[in-house]
Amino acid sequence: MTRLAFARSLLVVAVLATGTNAGAATADPDWPCVQRKVPQLSLGQVWNGPDLPPSAKDWSDDASVSALVEDVAARRLPLGDAQKKIRDFAASLPAEQLAPKMAMVMQGMFDHMDAERSHVISGISRYAHRQLEMAADLRKQASDVDALRAKPDADPDEVERRTDQLNFATRIFTERAQSLTYVCDVPTIIEQRLYQLAKTVSETLAAKK
């Protein structure tokens, strides 16, 4: 297979892969994931406990709660370790502080992780939009190389140079498309982690009743 044929085959596969997913689960043309785009979560999607009091929104003013939220929200911390931190924190509280403090923990986790998730979703849309721009540019490059090769007086060295450039750009495009597949899972991973952490908070409250 010639360099140009290889580049064109890569380009066709990559562009088709991008086009297959783009907007698959939403009307947003910049959304490339098969997962449905939900820019923001609602508290009710992850929390089955009692209604949180208005004071829970002040969670960031409490240093201990804020530090716990920061720790358990980090995906680098294994889920089991994060759940243990929540249980240990609840166990350290006086009985009269358990409900208000854990409500703040829940509100804090929701605010922090929902914001992180929304940030990831925005990044995915920007990334996908750039992919569409790159795909259009690659199609133009391939067309230009075809036109150059069709010229009777085409410089073979120039054809080879332009073809190598197209090959390289197409590989970059394909690698980015493959990376996007993994990134698309991140919003769901964050949502599932938040749900499990919320369940742990609910269990600490139920245990003290």
Q: Each predicted region: which residue ranges?
A:
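Heptad-repeat alpha-helical rod positions in long coiled-coil/spectrin-like domains
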Residues: S118, S125, H129, A136, ...
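Alpha-helical oligomerization segments
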Residues: D157-K209
